[in-house]
């Protein structure tokens, strides 16, 4: 069975051979072997509830369900239900329900905003309509937040996974400007652990004047 793959939020710059460079001095990385993300899987509390929630609130259809009493890769006894949701454009979001395991939690040392899944929508109109619809269903929504390249809203699914809906709003020249400073920013961060200011325009609003 062929499963769908990635959803590219922005057409990020590439190096000469299509792979992201290993560093600023090495613009010819190894030939990429990965074609795309096959699927992303998370744990869920209740597979049926999760499938219905994603279909109701995000319009994501259930692609298939897989259930076993043992883990195919290890043979370990561990009954599970594995569901696959259609995330659009050939992308799949999957979940495991593990009824014999301790209740799921999260990494308490990592802030709740950090680990999240971003899903693209086609317009600001769609983004704002989604916020209204989610809020009317009693789901707390943050945003829209302006990231210059895109605007986003944030909320949590029934399992505590943070979700982002993003609408591309990047202007000509933005990606090229970011591409020029990416390694300088990373190397400065590695030394100082303080946010470099090369791309402060993304969140201070000055991009509106810089990129017409």
List each model region and its residues.
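Short glycine-/small-residue motifs
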Residues: 92-95, 165
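Core segments of cupin and vicinal oxygen chelate
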Residues: 43-92
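Vicinal oxygen chelate
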Residues: 2-3, 7, 16, 23-32, 37-45, 84-88, 105-133, 151-156, ...
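A short, acidic/glycine-rich surface segment
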Residues: 69-73, 100-106
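Histidine- and/or cysteine-centered catalytic micro-motif in compact active-site loops
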Residues: 98-100, 122
């Amino acid at each position: 069975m062929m499963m769908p793959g990635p959803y590219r939020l922005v057409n990020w710059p590439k190096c000469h051979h299509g792979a992201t460079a290993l560093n600023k001095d090495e613009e010819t990385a190894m030939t990429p072997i990965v074609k795309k993300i096959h699927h992303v899987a998370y744990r869920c509390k209740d597979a049926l509830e999760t499938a219905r929630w994603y279909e109701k609130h995000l319009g994501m259809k259930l692609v298939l369900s897989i259930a076993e009493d043992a883990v195919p890769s290890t043979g370990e006894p561990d009954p599970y239900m594995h569901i696959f949701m259609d995330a659009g454009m050939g992308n799949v979001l999957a979940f495991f329900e593990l009824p014999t395991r301790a209740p799921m939690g999260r990494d308490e040392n990592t802030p709740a905003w950090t680990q999240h899944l971003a899903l693209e929508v086609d317009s600001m109109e769609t983004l704002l309509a989604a916020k209204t619809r989610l809020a009317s269903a009693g789901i707390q929504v943050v945003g829209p937040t302006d990231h210059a390249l895109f605007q986003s809203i944030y909320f949590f699914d029934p399992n505590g996974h943070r979700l982002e809906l993003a609408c591309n709003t990047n202007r000509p020249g933005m990606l090229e400007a970011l591409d020029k400073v990416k390694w300088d920013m990373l190397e400065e961060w590695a030394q100082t652990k303080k946010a470099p200011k090369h791309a402060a325009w993304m969140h201070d609003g000055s991009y509106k004047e810089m990129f017409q």
